[in-house]
Amino acid sequence: MNQQTDKAILVVSFGTSYEASRKATIEKIEQDIRNAFQDHRIYRAWTSKFIISILKKRDNYTVPTVKEALEQMITDGIREVVVQPTHILDGIENNIMKEEVLSYKESFDKIAFGTPLLADSKDESQAINAVTTEFSDLKETEALVFMGHGTTHQVNTVYAGLDQKFKESAHANVFIGTVEVDPAIHDLVKEVTSFQPSKIYVTPFMIVAGNHAHNDMAGDSPDSWVCQFENAGFEVCPIIKGLGEYPGIRRMYVEHAQKAIDSMK
C-alpha cells in the first residue's frame, strides 16, 4: 500500500460479530482490493453500529463507522475516495451509507461509489456462475437452497429474478429465498418439495455467515430452514459459508471498484 498517496478506497460492510466469518469473508474482500489497487490506501468501515458496539465490549476490537473512517481520511490527507460497499443490493442500508458519505463531499476533491454485488443483469449472471462453480459436484437429484436476507426496499425483486435465472441457466435444482420477506421459506418448501430432491443443501446468500446463517438457517428452532425442510421429510445438509468466501464473488467487488476508479478519470 502506498502510504504517500492521496487516493483511497473505503470498503464498507454491514459487519459481523462472528470472527471466523469476518476473517474468511470481509477481510478476504478487503485483502483482494488491497492487492488489486496498491496505488490506493485501503480503509474499512461498518454500517452496523450495534455490531461495532458488541465487538468493542466483547473483544475490545474496534471497527470505525463510515463517519469515523471519513474523518480519518481527512486527517490523512486523502483527496480522492472510492467507496466500495460489500452489500449485495443497492437497498436501504446502501442508500443510507451513500447519503452519509456525500455529506462529506466538500472535504474531498472526488468521491465515487462502486456498486454493490448485484447492480444489473450482468452482475446477476456473473454471481450465478460464481456460486454454481463452487457447487459443481451437486447431483441433478439434489437441491441447493440459498438463504438471502431480503429487504422491504423495491430491489428485493432481485431475489425472485435470481431464482428464475438459476432455472434458465440449466440449474433447475437451485433455489433462493429470503429470511426477512418474500420469497419466504414456506413458499420454498413447497417449491423444493415439488422437485423431490434426494438431499437438500442449504447455504446463505449473504456475504458473511453470521447470525442468520447459524440460527435462522441452521439453528435448532422449529422455524429454522433446516428444521422446516427436515420436517417436510428431506435429508438436509447446512453449509455455513458466506458469499465472501467465494473467489468469483470477491472478484466482482474488485471489478466494481475498478469501474468506480475509471469513472473518476
What are these regions (language model features)?
Residues M1-K265:
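Active-site-proximal alpha-helix that buttresses catalytic centers in soluble enzyme cores
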